């Protein structure tokens, strides 16, 4: 489980290095792989970011997952539990599901940008690829290598090289995503990932199908 203590902010960015987190200036982060400058001078509009959702908006139970693409426990949930959860609870009309990205480091931000640039219809397909290959791209230790790996994931989803370059150079989207994350985390008191807001009640930690299913069933009763 990753905690919000090391969260990425607009003033600086957490980078996993040497077993700990260090802070880099936003200009250093962008220069590392030719990716967007997150300078505070750029406009920040949390309202410009739309939620990614699945299922019937009128379902009796609302589940909001907060997760980071670089969080190992989030990968465990998505690789081991999510597909069955979707089949049993979302596709059946019991749950309206919202996925909200959390940014503890620049790599998680870049991954979210690639997934969102694929579009709403392909978002969860890209998310699957990102979580399935997390160990291959998220811990390479070299920003340029991570960026190239993320581009390969995007290419598997059908994004062209030009589209991927434009996506990862979109400083406005990067700024807006971080502002959106911070607003959501503050409103819902998100402290770690994965966290699940189930009909307004927060639960933390990766869960099995039986565990999250029991919480959903309780919320529906």
Model-based region annotation:
Residues 48-50, 110, 164:
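Glycine-rich, flexible loop/turn motifs
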Residues 2-105, 178, 221:
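Extracytoplasmic thiol/disulfide redox context detector
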Residues 41, 55-57, 72, 80, ...:
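Surface-exposed loop/turn and secondary-structure junction residues enriched for glycine/proline
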Residues 2-24, 30, 34, 68, ...:
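C-terminal cap of thioredoxin/glutaredoxin-like
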Residues 67-70, 75-155:
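Structural alpha/beta surface segment adjacent to cysteine/selenocysteine redox centers
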Residues 47-49, 132, 198:
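Residue-level signal for pocket-adjacent positions within structured domains
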């Amino acid at each position: 489980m990753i905690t919000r203590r090391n969260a990425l902010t607009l003033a600086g960015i957490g980078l996993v290095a040497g077993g700990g987190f260090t802070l880099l200036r936003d200009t250093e982060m962008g220069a590392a792989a030719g990716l967007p400058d997150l300078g505070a001078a750029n406009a920040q509009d949390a309202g410009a970011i739309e939620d990614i959702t699945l299922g019937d908006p009128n379902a009796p139970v609302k589940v909001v997952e907060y997760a980071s693409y670089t969080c190992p426990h989030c990968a465990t949930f998505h690789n081991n539990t999510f597909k069955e959860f979707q089949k049993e609870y979302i596709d059946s009309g019991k749950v309206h599901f919202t996925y909200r990205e959390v940014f503890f480091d620049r790599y998680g931000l870049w991954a979210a940008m690639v997934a969102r640039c694929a579009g709403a219809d392909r978002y969860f397909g890209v998310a699957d690829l990102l979580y399935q290959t997390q160990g291959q791209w998220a811990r390479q230790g070299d920003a340029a290598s991570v960026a190239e790996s993320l581009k390969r994931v995007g290419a598997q989803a059908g994004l062209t090289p030009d589209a991927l370059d434009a996506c990862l150079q979109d400083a406005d989207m990067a700024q807006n995503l971080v502002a959106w994350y911070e607003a959501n985390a503050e409103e819902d008191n998100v402290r770690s990932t994965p966290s699940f807001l189930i009909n307004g009640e927060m639960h933390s930690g990766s869960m099995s199908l039986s565990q999250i299913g029991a919480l959903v069933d309780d919320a529906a009763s």
